[in-house]
């Protein structure tokens, strides 16, 4: 079992090119399954059955593992069995039909509008790194891109004159998104320093060496901007969440937000309606004369 796990991890790293962070999580989850199998005398993946996997999930849940973590474990198991089936090493998948226990859906963290503007309106030095980072921040917030969508952008995916960007989302689905004026200005300023004809790579965002910027490097640059401008932890997906929340708050058009985010299912987008309600509730509590509570009262 361990040998086949190593082969699967090599497949993920070399052929699927998953990040080391994702690979570490998958390996950790699948090693839990191997430990359970060893404990119960199961020597090969083919011998693991749905009842036993269900028992493992129940045990982990009983010991405090979150529904989110258990869902990730099941995803890792399904991925492994897809690989084993494709390689002719197994003929079934014990995770078929299994789902993790339901948990409360956590609302995504967002910046309010003032904080978003504070982040983006700070002074920008006219140098390579500063202009690139500003363009990255503006494009995340302007168009709601995923991290992978941003780092995979090539120069011909952007039409600044038309204010459009074409991205390739999950499942290889392409979509075209608007790019706002501030983001276009930031990109034009970045292009002047990027040297479009010089670097080897056609990526929109590159390093000083002329190579496509990595997702990890973008995470670190966004984190640094959050600490510098806002004094808080910031990650790329928070800018995507903020984009979605602010567009929905202004437009009330859930379907349009779904299309811009590239969500296959509108139920995924509906999480932002809860954020919008939170905002409306906060406005009500601060503005309505009968909503304000006296200090010390809780009823």
From Swiss-Prot:
It comes from the Bacteria. Its main location: cytoplasm. CDD domains: INT_XerDC_C. GO terms for biological process: cell division; chromosome segregation; DNA transposition. The keyword Zinc-finger does not apply. Residues 106-285 form the Tyr recombinase domain. The active site is at residues 146, 170, 237, 240, 263, 272. Belongs to the 'phage' integrase family. XerC subfamily. Forms a cyclic heterotetrameric complex composed of two molecules of XerC and two molecules of XerD. Site-specific tyrosine recombinase, which acts by catalyzing the cutting and rejoining of the recombining DNA molecules. The XerC-XerD complex is essential to convert dimers of the bacterial chromosome into monomers to permit their segregation at cell division. It also contributes to the segregational stability of plasmids. This is Tyrosine recombinase XerC. It comes from Pseudomonas putida (strain ATCC 700007 / DSM 6899 / JCM 31910 / BCRC 17059 / LMG 24140 / F1).
């Amino acid at each position: 079992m361990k040998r086949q796990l190593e082969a699967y991890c090599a497949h993920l790293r070399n052929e699927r090119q998953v990040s080391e962070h994702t690979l570490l999580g998958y390996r950790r989850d699948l090693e839990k399954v191997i430990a359970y199998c060893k404990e119960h005398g199961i020597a090969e993946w083919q011998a693991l059955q749905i009842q036993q996997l269900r028992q493992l999930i129940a045990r982990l849940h009983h010991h405090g593992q979150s529904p989110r973590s258990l869902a990730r474990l099941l995803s890792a198991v399904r991925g492994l069995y897809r690989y084993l089936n494709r390689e002719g090493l197994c003929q079934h998948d014990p995770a078929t039909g299994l789902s993790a226990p339901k948990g409360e859906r956590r609302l995504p963290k967002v910046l309010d509008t003032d904080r978003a503007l504070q982040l983006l309106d700070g002074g920008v030095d006219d140098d390579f790194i500063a202009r690139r980072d500003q363009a990255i921040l503006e494009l995340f917030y302007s168009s709601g891109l995923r991290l992978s969508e941003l780092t995979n952008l090539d120069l011909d995916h952007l039409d600044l004159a038309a204010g459009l960007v074409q991205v390739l989302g999950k499942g290889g689905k392409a979509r075209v998104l608007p790019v706002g004026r501030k983001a276009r200005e930031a990109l034009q300023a970045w292009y002047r320093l990027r040297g479009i004809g010089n670097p080897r790579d056609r990526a929109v965002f590159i390093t000083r060496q002329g190579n496509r910027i990595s997702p990890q490097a973008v995470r670190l640059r966004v984190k640094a901007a959050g600490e510098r401008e806002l004094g808080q932890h910031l990650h790329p997906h928070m800018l995507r969440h903020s984009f979605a929340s602010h567009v929905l708050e202004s437009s009330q058009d859930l379907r349009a937000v779904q299309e811009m985010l590239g969500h296959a299912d509108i139920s995924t987008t509906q999480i932002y309606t809860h954020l919008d309600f939170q905002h409306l509730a906060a406005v009500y509590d601060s503005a309505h004369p009968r909503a304000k509570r006296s200090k010390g009262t809780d009823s």
